[in-house]
From Swiss-Prot:
Organism: Brachyspira pilosicoli (Serpulina pilosicoli)
Gene: rpsJ
InterPro entries for this protein: Ribosomal_uS10, Ribosomal_uS10_CS, Ribosomal_uS10_dom, Ribosomal_uS10_dom_sf
Subunit structure comment from the entry: Part of the 30S ribosomal subunit.
Similarity-based family: Belongs to the universal ribosomal protein uS10 family.
Molecular-function annotations in GO: structural constituent of ribosome; tRNA binding
Gene Ontology cellular-component terms listed: ribonucleoprotein complex; ribosome
Stated name of the protein: Small ribosomal subunit protein uS10
Family annotation (SUPFAM superfamilies): Ribosomal protein S10
Domain of life where this protein originates: Bacteria
NCBIfam families on file: PRK00596.1, rpsJ_bact
Keywords in alphabetical order: Ribonucleoprotein, Ribosomal protein
Entry annotated with the keyword Ribonucleoprotein: yes
Described function: Involved in the binding of tRNA to the ribosomes.
Length: 101
């Protein structure tokens, strides 16, 4: 029989928020007796946008903005019904996107 595994992917704009969320997930899963691998930091995606500062004069004057998306990966092995219930009941901040597979 194949071992049951849950893969949790976290995405957020704030690095402190994603690290706190990952630690709370790991702590709640370890209480149920499951094995945890992670949080594994994935590459940060950076999107840069360049805009012109003024609409008419100084066309060479530009300003750059960037948006960073931080990602973490957590693998959970030996999943029990208590593990899934603890993940369902876990309250995470609004700025963190969670994907379960």
């Amino acid at each position: 029989m194949k071992e049951q595994k849950i893969r949790v992917k976290l995405k957020a704009f704030d690095i402190e928020l994603i690290d706190q969320s990952a630690q709370s997930i790991v702590a709640s899963v370890k209480k149920t007796g499951a094995r945890v691998s992670g949080p594994i930091p994935l590459p940060t995606s950076i999107r840069k946008v360049t805009v012109i500062r003024s609409p008419h004069v100084n066309i060479k004057s530009r300003e750059q903005f960037e948006m960073r998306v931080y990602k973490r990966l957590i693998d959970i092995f030996d999943v029990t019904p208590q593990t899934t219930e603890s993940l369902k009941k876990l309250a995470l901040p609004a700025g963190v996107d969670v994907q379960l597979k």
